[in-house]
A protein has these predicted regions:
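Extended assembly-interface regions of large multimeric machines
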Residues: 1-60, 64-71, 77-123
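Conserved, function-critical positions that sit in or immediately flank catalytic
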Residues: 93-191
Length: 191
């Protein structure tokens, strides 16, 4: 109402126009010797455990499969993920990462802080957009809906003399997985 607007204006202390804004998440720097968790949308309390990282090159990756040793125990990450491919990044330490985006120079100078890092969704990018936005849009557009990129073991069973066959049913193609056993128990599924 007019009375409400007048009351607001009379009691106004000050207004400041904001030019640059960004969504942010807690910053998680990739660090050798750290154990990262694979992303799991059923876990509450994110961002703990750490399931994403920002590298020294300001590339952001999502951990889709944790590195594991021959007995199925989680191992620390020792190889920093690199590259901006639309495919998964497999590192020598057994981790599998999904490249998400690069924090460009402009975003880094304004929103990258010691405790937080910017995130964004690119609706559309054109030839006048920063290269980081064009690459991010390419990555977003290459995402495959309902793609199986990891399998979590909830019960490894017992008594296996050899690795059982892993069958993936669905409407896609080329999905393969191999079971890893230790002591007669399935301890890992490698995609």
């Amino acid at each position: 109402s007019i009375a409400t607007e007048r009351d607001f204006r009379q009691n106004l202390q000050g207004v400041r126009q904001i030019a640059d804004i960004s969504f942010v998440v807690p910053r998680v720097n990739w660090s050798s010797g750290t154990t990262y968790s694979a992303y799991d949308d059923s876990v509450v309390g994110y961002p703990t455990p750490n399931f994403y990282v920002i590298t020294g090159a300001n590339d952001v990756y999502l951990c889709v499969q944790q590195g594991r040793n021959s007995t199925g125990a989680a191992v620390a990450s020792t190889v920093e993920p690199t590259g901006n491919a639309t495919t998964l990044v497999k590192t020598a330490d057994g981790y599998i990462w999904k490249y998400l985006y690069t924090v460009g120079a402009y975003s880094a100078s304004r929103f990258l802080a010691g405790n937080f890092m910017p995130v964004q969704f690119i609706d559309s990018a054109d030839s006048s957009s920063p290269i980081s936005e064009i690459v991010q849009e390419t990555i977003q557009n290459a995402a495959i809906n309902r793609q199986v990129i990891g399998i979590a073991i909830t019960s490894g069973g017992s008594g296996y003399a050899s690795a059982p066959a892993v069958t993936i049913s669905g409407d896609g193609t080329l999905a393969t997985a191999t079971a890893v056993i230790s002591g007669g128990v399935v301890v890992n599924i490698k995609m």
